Amino acid sequence: MARADMIRELREIGYAVQELGDGCISFPFAVTVGRFAGQTITVGLLVGEDWPFNPPSGPHISPSLLPINPAAIWPHGGIHGPRCRPFMAGGGQYWSRPHPNWVGTKRSARDYIAHLNMVFDALA
């Protein structure tokens, strides 16, 4: 399996995925939990060819929602400028939020979306 499989999985569960090149994908994401609930943002992910063995690292978020704060702790820290070339032109942020227990999941796009929801819920 590879990046194309994650793209297919995301599309199967209703996400309009765009392939940006350099291993990067993006899609509109309706935030349903936490203090940003009700907003639709763009989530960008750097997906390796080793999907689903390894998940994407943290998400790129656009527009910027939190102050850049690389040194602080979860849930308000680990916020950086964009790190993947296709996301740099549009601004936004990279949130250092790796999945905490990927091996304990089915390693699916649904599991990664659940992780995103957990990240947003922690910002309540």
Model-derived segments and spans:
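Strand-helix-loop interaction patch of compact alpha/beta domains
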Residues: M1-Q39
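Hydrophobic, Leu/Ile/Phe/Ala-enriched alpha-helical segments that form helix-helix packing faces
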Residues: M6-G14, V47, L116-L123
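Preference for bulky hydrophobic residues occupying beta-strand positions
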Residues: F27-F29, L45, G58
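A short, structural micro-pattern
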Residues: A37, P52-F53
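Broad gene-expression machinery/nucleic-acid interaction feature
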Residues: T40-T42, P55
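Proline-anchored loop/turn motifs at beta-strand termini and strand-loop-strand connectors
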Residues: G44-P52
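Domain-scale recognition of soluble eukaryotic interaction modules
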Residues: P55-A124
